[in-house]
Each structure stands twice: as C-alpha cells, then as structure tokens.
Amino acid sequence: MVERSHRPHLNPHRHTKKEERKIKKAFEKYYERYGWYGVYEELKRKGYKRSFSGMVYAAKRMGLKEKRTKKSPRKQARRYPELLMPGEKVQIDVKEVPYNCLRGDALKYGRRFYQWTAIDECTRYRFVYAFEEHTPENTVKFLKMLLKEFPFKIQKIQTDNGTEFTYKYISDNEISPLDKVLQALKIPHILIPPRTPWHNGKVERSHRNDQRYFYNWETFKTLDELNEKLKKHLEWSNNKIMRTLGMKSPVQLLAEKLAA
C-alpha cells in the first residue's frame, strides 16, 4: 500500500470564519474611502491581532480586491536622505479647496477656500488649517499657529516660490511677510527650484491623500465647517499607519523620536 501524506489539509494559521466575516464587513465599510490601511485600523480597533500583510492576503483570497486603474508610467523619483529628527525640515504648501466641495453661501457667493499644510519630513506629522484668502498675511497667521501646534522646534522651512511665501522673483528689495518673521525667529527658509514641485514631494503627496480621503467625500457651507472637518481629518491622518514609516503612524513615530 502507498503511504498517505500526513500533512494537514488546512493551514493551521489560516483566518477563522469569524475573522473572515470581520474582514469582509470592514472592507465593505471602509475600503472605498480609506483603502487597506483604513480597513486594518478598523479591524485593530475591534481586537484583530494579525499582521497587515496577513489581512490583505486573506481578503484577496476571499475575493475582496481593489478596483484596478491604469496608471501612466512615472519617472524614477530621486531619493533624498531621510531626516532623523523631528523639525529638521518642515515642508509647507497651499491647496485650493475644490469648487465642487462648496455648498450653501460658499457656493452662492463664489467664495474660495485654501488649505495651508505643514508636514515634518522626518515623521510625516502634519498641521493643516484653511483660510478664505490666498495671501502672504495668512501664511504668517498659519506659521504662528504651526509653531504652537508642533511639539518640537522647527529648524528649517521649505516652500515653493509662490508670492504667499516669497517675493524673490517679483522684487529685489521687498521682503515677504513670511521671510520677515522667519528672519526674526532665525529659522532658515529654503526655496525649491522654480517649477519643480517634486522637491516638495511629501507635502504634495499629502495633498493628494487629502483629495482622496477627504475632499472626494466632504462638502462645506462655511469656512468654519471646513476647519471643523479638517480638524477631524487631520487627527485621522496623523494616526494613519504608513508603510514608509515601518507600519507606524506619524503620531507613533513622533512619540518614539521625542522619547529617544
């Protein structure tokens, strides 16, 4: 007689039916807006103990897959050395709030809202706030708020060459309001080369994520409503795990860095 295999027919580490039901429920509720990381965070809140990759593998085995979209090939981005300490360099940029998010008086009176964003290059920890006018004065207001919000000293600030940040390309003599404040604080202001937004890649990427996870889903009647919703979104994004941070959130990495 031929000896039969003694190997188990089922993987002992395979997800249980109960775990699979939880994955399916979380996927249906959170994937479309928040992606795999949103699904994983929800499962962890419900006591799920397995790894992120294990969850994705199980979900795909169950037939839960993302919709594939054709992506145009991208040039290989230049890699820059990762910074080691919070505050070594903070990127700042402005995003115009999409017009199709406006409702009520904001839409009726043709208002425009603008989101200022600061992101710490080391930890990806962010601060955001919206204003109604795209002006240098609002950049200074944002900076003053930022200095109170970030729990570490900012050593350098990097921006593009927009007039809300610098007058370098429009005046040989006049200094922008932001530069006046930064000079008084002895914080260097780094300007990226003209027409090279990839040099501010981290804040640009964060704006794309804001579009995907926030603006594609929300509407606003007033500036106050926008800032209230932005506050909740900011808390979520600062606590969202990131593969680039070793499956940690900006809040987790920041706490580790400050405790070291």
Where are these regions (language model features)?
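Active-site beta-loop-alpha junctions of metal-dependent nucleic acid enzymes
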Residues: Y109-R112, V128-K156
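C-terminal domain-tail junction helix/linker
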Residues: L185-I187, R208-A260
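An active-site-proximal beta-strand-loop segment
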Residues: I92-F127, E137
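Short, well-ordered secondary-structure micro-motifs
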Residues: L102, Y167-I170
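Mobile genetic element proteins and their domesticated derivatives, centered on retroelements
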Residues: I23-A26, V39, M55, D93, ...
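RNase H-like two-metal-ion nuclease catalytic core shared by retroviral integrases
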Residues: T159-N161, Y169-R212, K231-K232, L253-L254
